[in-house]
Amino acid sequence: MILVVNAGSSSIKFRLFNDLDKSNPIDILDGLAERITVDGAVSFKYEGKKYEYNVELPNHEVAIKFILDKLIELNIISNVDDINAVGFRVVHGGTISKSSIIDQKVFDTIKDAVKLAPLHNPGAITAIEAIEKVMPKAKLVACFDTAYHQTLAEEQYLYAVPYSWYKEHGVRKYGFHGISYQYIAEKMSEVLAKPKDQLNLIVCHLGNGASITCIKNGKSFDTTMGLTPLAGVMMGTRSGDIDPSIIEYMCKELQLDVSKITNILNKESGLLGLSGKSSDMRDVTGGYFKGDEDYKRALNKYTQVSADYIIRFANLLGHNIDGIVFTAGVGENSIHTRQFILEKLPLLDIEIDNAKNEESYGDYKYISSPNSKIKVLAVRTNEELMICKDTINLTK
């Protein structure tokens, strides 16, 4: 079996896969340990039943041990050795270009990247150390959100700042959501019956965190997020791209230091900042149709910024666009967000089929009409399955 782990500073999302068929692993259990170091709660779903526990979780090691003990107690596994490998989602892998077995060199790279992802990498490090103690025989694999974007050309990843900043301090565009983009590229190769290395896509990963990526010949060619996940399109609570001078200006205006202003740009901006009310797209679209001016302002800006990047990436692909894909929480589920973005793309001659856009679906659906010059789809991403597959390939 394969365990997939996505750990934060106080939470662990986990999913267990049966890998008897290595080419088609099946997820059998999905769970969450949360409020680690505060008080603690563990919940998971197995065979249609939900299990919930309130338990003291002083650290990640105790949380993982509790999870494994419950899996044994419920006869889901007979012992920890039934799990032969663990795949970790790691947000920042520096310049590592593919999923990797975690050896000392890879682990040191993850630690070095903490300064680039201070909100995300520490949780992964803590979880890796905990699982090494609790599951000493398991093979450990790191899957990086940055790895997929290591194919960017220099003109895409460099910033117009002193070159020494890049050479000496690693200041460059890294990009994120790479595990999701990797999954979507593979899925779209199946859907369109086209070899992945010939695939040209514009993929909109729109969740609370959001980014858009231009995929050319199956590889990341450009992407919206940058050195950190703060850059690019407008998001739930993140600003996306702004004039860098705003930071110094608002430090002086509000008498706050840089870290506090950066925190506002990360946690109090985006949809939440412009509406002053909510970061949840369901609230925003609901308010929009009730005539709420604050939500109108937020949604109009969000959809315009997204459309602007799609046009920019369409230019990079020329007349060879196999499809525009919407994925992640907002992209998969928000009918009106998709519609409003597509309506802001007159140059692309896209024709939306409103009935298709509104209907429920399984893994994917077309939302463009047969007359549309470019195919448009909503596709459900599956980062955990992608991590599982990479883990199997590296450990079999």
Swiss-Prot record:
Keyword Endoplasmic reticulum (UniProt): no
Residues binding Mg(2+), per UniProt: N6, E383
Any matching Pfam family: Acetate_kinase
Residues the record lists as binding ATP: K13, H205, L206, G207, N208, G209, D280, M281, R282, G329, V330, G331, E332, N333
Catalytic residue list: D145
A Gene Ontology term for the protein's cellular component: cytoplasm
Catalytic activity reported: acetate + ATP = acetyl phosphate + ADP
GO biological process: acetate metabolic process; acetyl-CoA biosynthetic process
GO MF annotations in UniProt: acetate kinase activity; ATP binding; magnesium ion binding
EC number per UniProt: 2.7.2.1
InterPro entries in the cross-refs: Ac/propionate_kinase, Aliphatic_acid_kin_short-chain, Aliphatic_acid_kinase_CS, ATPase_NBD
Known cofactor(s): Mg(2+); Mn(2+)
Top EC class for this record: transferase
Pathway(s) the chain acts in: Metabolic intermediate biosynthesis; acetyl-CoA biosynthesis; acetyl-CoA from acetate: step 1/2
Site (Transition state stabilizer): H177, R238
Localisation: Cytoplasm
UniProt entry keywords in alphabetical sequence: ATP-binding, Cytoplasm, Kinase, Magnesium, Metal-binding, Nucleotide-binding, Transferase
Cofactor note as given: Mg(2+). Can also accept Mn(2+).
Oligomeric form and interacting partners: Homodimer.
PANTHER family, per database record: ACETATE KINASE (PTHR21060), ACETATE KINASE-RELATED (PTHR21060:SF15)
Protein family membership: Belongs to the acetokinase family.
Function per UniProt: Catalyzes the formation of acetyl phosphate from acetate and ATP. Can also catalyze the reverse reaction.
Designated name of the protein: Acetate kinase
